[in-house]
Amino acid sequence: MAERGGAGGGPGGSGGGSSQRGSGVAQSPQQQPQQQPPQPQQPTPPKLAQATSSSSSTSAAAASSSSSSTSTSMAVAVASGSAPPGGPGPGRTPAPVQMNLYATWEVDRSSSSCVPRLFSLTLKKLVMLKEMDKDLNSVVIAVKLQGSKRILRSNEIILPASGLVETELQLTFSLQYPHFLKRDANKLQIMLQRRKRYKNRTILGYKTLAVGLINMAEVMQHPNEGALVLGLHSNVKDVSVPVAEIKIYSLSSQPIDHEGIKSKLSDRSPDIDNYSEEEEESFSSEQEGSDDPLHGQDLFYEDEDLRKVKKTRRKLTSTSAITRQPNIKQKFVALLKRFKVSDEVGFGLEHVSREQIREVEEDLDELYDSLEMYNPSDSGPEMEETESILSTPKPKLKPFFEGMSQSSSQTEIGSLNSKGSLGKDTTSPMELAALEKVKSTWIKNQDDSLTETDTLEITDQDMFGDVSTSLVVPEKVKTPMKSSKADLQGSASPSKVEGTHTPRQKRSTPLKERQLSKPLSERTNSSDSERSPDLGHSTQIPRKVVYDQLNQILVSDAALPENVILVNTTDWQGQYVAELLQDQRKPVVCTCSTVEVQAVLSALLTRIQRYCNCNSSMPRPVKVAAVGSQSYLSSILRFFVKSLASKTPDWLGYMRFLIIPLGSHPVAKYLGSVDSRYSSTFLDSAWRDLFSRSEPPVSEPLDVVGRVMQYVNGATTTHQLPVAEAMLTCRHKFPDEDSYQKFIPFIGVVKVGLVEDSPSTAGDGDDSPVVSLTVPSTSPPSSSGLSRDATATPPSSPSMSSALAIVGSPNSPYGDVIGLQVDYWLGHPGERRREGDKRDASSKNTLKSVFRSVQVSRLPHAGEAQLSGTMAMTVVTKEKNKKVPTIFLSKKPREKEVDSKSQVIEGISRLICSAKQQQTMLRVSIDGVEWSDIKFFQLAAQWPTHVKHFPVGLFSGSKTT
């Protein structure tokens, strides 16, 4: 609650009112009906909480809360008949203090054993057995769950001046509270409190005088409707001597019927059923601090009218249509009853009006939409870890051009709109010619499993917003493979972009790099999928062939597969390996997009969950082989970290990932330094030469399947790679929108480069990763000077290889460097920078200069199996003159040294990198996936959840942790 309740004290009280946070309502004496005789109070309904009583004075109660303002609670209390100060007069019987209080406390949804229940308590009498405090003229009765911060207090109860007193009460507490089924944490505390005082002045806060405990588990099993005496003790340890007693009239704990409540009250948002227990009490931010709940109720009914007006406009089905099958059955039964024709009426429909028929047709349309959204399969799209695309969209103007950029808030809406426009002919003649060539290749392959989704894959590319007249498609048609249809999508999918190369490249550049490049017009006018590579995949649907391959592997709930091989088939290398494995009937799943990777891993996690439910023994780790580039492994890592964050830590041992590199792969290179058998299998020259070609070989030069299965069968040891965190602050395309943040896990290398405005060329080296992010240069590339020097002095971290080559771009307006400010903190006081830097490791260190490149690695040193808790950074700077700045390491200049110098800083626990000029946007590559329009980013050496390591399988004889 955002405001303090304005409740006043009873007659003769302090008059200060309740100072606790909450909301209350008080009725004036003129509006109250005649007082009824005392009787047990029923629990107040959650929505229309109302209490009536009669008296010359009333006051409101407040629900105290010390939690955050995001949780909602409401307390309604009416007090009457408070005894006057000084006790009752002669011959008069004091009227009982009457109050009705209601509150809703939040439920811990992370625990499956926590359920909401409604607790009702009626207090009849307060007996003070001992004098607890001098000058005690008023007390407050409060209830609180043990271990919780929420407190529900009554108004001040005025006590007579005499010491030992009996006060008649008629207090009713109705609490919706979280009940834990599997632990002893259901103790309700009934406390006797008074206002705190300082030098005879009342101050904020309450002092607890006595406490009594009620076991809610016993109340749930044995409700009490008779007289019950609860002793209150000033010392919890000494329960033999009570200082006060409270007589309880009724005591009960009842379950909450959410279905009955929701059948009477309409939902107010499309996704209200996601959290059905608490959403019924939610108000908008403007009304959360209101002291008048009736005002909130009026707004609720106004919102009901608005929903009726907008019924025809809102066609998005709520998430309950996906997750709750009983609702669909109820709708269907209700519709069948409406269509049932009685014998008296006959078969004539003349009495049915057109309006009724139109209303039934609308209901049928909504039902069909619900049935289409609901997918009962165990490995279907409902298990995907995608962002919510069914939330209420912000009103925005539709872009004039279909392929132009949208903000991330509009990407969700556009993804739904694109589904309805799959049949539109929006392709240009050049695109049609390219698509015809691709389609002819598919027909030649005679692949029946792919013919059903030809149209879907073409339109999926349109949904990425990256189709243009310069799309490089015909080059890939040279190589007809089984899954060659995915190449069309591979040239546009941003999660598979492994470099920043453009079509104007050297002939020595591998075909894979040229095919995965994007034209300049696309990079400058692309959609949000370029800025956020995983946003564009929310519109995709996994192909039918993916589910067919999964069904062949996941055959039974009683047994788990020993291994699953995931292959990235967006390029010829993956298609080549997949075809060889499929010929020998290996458990292969061909994936072409991030959403398909998520679908496969979701199905695997679901099957592991079913196995655990059916078996008492722990499952053995399932080997998941990832055949592809570093960016492909990054998509698997992101889903792994996100999915297992909501599961218990023992799930971290249920899967073991096997990395099979196709092309340059920094993580695989580190694994080869730890495991010599792994290095000889996947890092030898024969393997590299095979997959660095521009086209697949005519004959098989080496036993690819034998090497893969040798690794799959022999990887019996788990090596834990630490998972680091990258927080990216991205700029929206629209200037009036605020920036947003993305949290990306990574295990390899993060590289920083300048946003290019012109085409650039890329050198090709065997040791440099394909994903090397380049900085524009005003000089032509030099293969003999700069790159060699950048990695020679001082020796860089072996895990970073030699990917510090500076690539030139003569037309770049920024020159060959970028001004950056890098703030970093060292992890341990004992770790210092190389070359003997003596600065304090616990303080912030800053590098502020012009950089040619910045690269941060989370991988340990080559050959070191011992994991470190820090990162290593390699920077290449440009020297303005012969004088070395004080912030850099001092060294003697070489004779043939160019105007750059390399520096390695180790032991970094946290790092923040930003451009010197605010208008300069950065481009960041994280484990091979490129992210653009970055204002600044922050790196942390450890991922914040319990998923802190990525389990990788190695051969048994390797040096593992």
Swiss-Prot record:
<feature type="compositionally biased region" description="Gly residues">
    <location>
        <begin position="1"/>
        <end position="19"/>
    </location>
</feature>
<dbReference type="Pfam" id="PF25332">
    <property type="entry name" value="C2_PACS_N"/>
</dbReference>
<feature type="region of interest" description="Disordered">
    <location>
        <begin position="375"/>
        <end position="426"/>
    </location>
</feature>
<feature type="modified residue" description="Phosphotyrosine">
    <location>
        <position position="249"/>
    </location>
</feature>
<dbReference type="Pfam" id="PF10254">
    <property type="entry name" value="Pacs-1"/>
</dbReference>
<keyword id="KW-0597">Phosphoprotein</keyword>
<feature type="modified residue" description="Phosphoserine">
    <location>
        <position position="379"/>
    </location>
</feature>
<feature type="compositionally biased region" description="Basic and acidic residues">
    <location>
        <begin position="260"/>
        <end position="271"/>
    </location>
</feature>
<feature type="compositionally biased region" description="Polar residues">
    <location>
        <begin position="404"/>
        <end position="426"/>
    </location>
</feature>
<dbReference type="GO" id="GO:0002260">
    <property type="term" value="P:lymphocyte homeostasis"/>
</dbReference>
<feature type="compositionally biased region" description="Low complexity">
    <location>
        <begin position="51"/>
        <end position="70"/>
    </location>
</feature>
<feature type="modified residue" description="Phosphoserine">
    <location>
        <position position="377"/>
    </location>
</feature>
<feature type="modified residue" description="Phosphoserine">
    <location>
        <position position="527"/>
    </location>
</feature>
<feature type="modified residue" description="Phosphoserine">
    <location>
        <position position="517"/>
    </location>
</feature>
<feature type="modified residue" description="Phosphoserine">
    <location>
        <position position="526"/>
    </location>
</feature>
<feature type="compositionally biased region" description="Acidic residues">
    <location>
        <begin position="274"/>
        <end position="291"/>
    </location>
</feature>
<keyword id="KW-0007">Acetylation</keyword>
<feature type="modified residue" description="Phosphothreonine">
    <location>
        <position position="502"/>
    </location>
</feature>
<feature type="region of interest" description="Disordered">
    <location>
        <begin position="758"/>
        <end position="802"/>
    </location>
</feature>
<feature type="compositionally biased region" description="Low complexity">
    <location>
        <begin position="768"/>
        <end position="802"/>
    </location>
</feature>
<dbReference type="GO" id="GO:0072659">
    <property type="term" value="P:protein localization to plasma membrane"/>
</dbReference>
<feature type="region of interest" description="Disordered">
    <location>
        <begin position="260"/>
        <end position="297"/>
    </location>
</feature>
<dbReference type="InterPro" id="IPR019381">
    <property type="entry name" value="Phosphofurin_acidic_CS-1"/>
</dbReference>
<feature type="modified residue" description="Phosphoserine">
    <location>
        <position position="493"/>
    </location>
</feature>
<comment type="subunit">
    <text>Associates with AP-1 and AP-3 but not with AP-2 complexes. Interacts with FURIN. Forms a ternary complex with FURIN and AP-1. Interacts with PKD2 (via acidic region). Interacts with SORL1. Interacts with WDR37.</text>
</comment>
<dbReference type="GO" id="GO:0030137">
    <property type="term" value="C:COPI-coated vesicle"/>
</dbReference>
<feature type="modified residue" description="Phosphoserine">
    <location>
        <position position="532"/>
    </location>
</feature>
<feature type="modified residue" description="N-acetylalanine">
    <location>
        <position position="2"/>
    </location>
</feature>
<feature type="modified residue" description="Phosphothreonine">
    <location>
        <position position="44"/>
    </location>
</feature>
<feature type="region of interest" description="Disordered">
    <location>
        <begin position="1"/>
        <end position="70"/>
    </location>
</feature>
<feature type="coiled-coil region">
    <location>
        <begin position="351"/>
        <end position="375"/>
    </location>
</feature>
<feature type="modified residue" description="Phosphoserine">
    <location>
        <position position="28"/>
    </location>
</feature>
<protein>
    <recommendedName>
        <fullName>Phosphofurin acidic cluster sorting protein 1</fullName>
    </recommendedName>
</protein>
<dbReference type="GO" id="GO:0034067">
    <property type="term" value="P:protein localization to Golgi apparatus"/>
</dbReference>
<keyword id="KW-0175">Coiled coil</keyword>
<comment type="function">
    <text>Coat protein that is involved in the localization of trans-Golgi network (TGN) membrane proteins that contain acidic cluster sorting motifs. Controls the endosome-to-Golgi trafficking of furin and mannose-6-phosphate receptor by connecting the acidic-cluster-containing cytoplasmic domain of these molecules with the adapter-protein complex-1 (AP-1) of endosomal clathrin-coated membrane pits. Required for normal ER Ca2+ handling in lymphocytes. Together with WDR37, it plays an essential role in lymphocyte development, quiescence and survival.</text>
</comment>
<feature type="region of interest" description="Disordered">
    <location>
        <begin position="76"/>
        <end position="95"/>
    </location>
</feature>
<dbReference type="GO" id="GO:0005794">
    <property type="term" value="C:Golgi apparatus"/>
</dbReference>
<feature type="region of interest" description="Disordered">
    <location>
        <begin position="475"/>
        <end position="540"/>
    </location>
</feature>
<keyword id="KW-0333">Golgi apparatus</keyword>
<feature type="compositionally biased region" description="Low complexity">
    <location>
        <begin position="20"/>
        <end position="34"/>
    </location>
</feature>
<dbReference type="GO" id="GO:0044325">
    <property type="term" value="F:transmembrane transporter binding"/>
</dbReference>
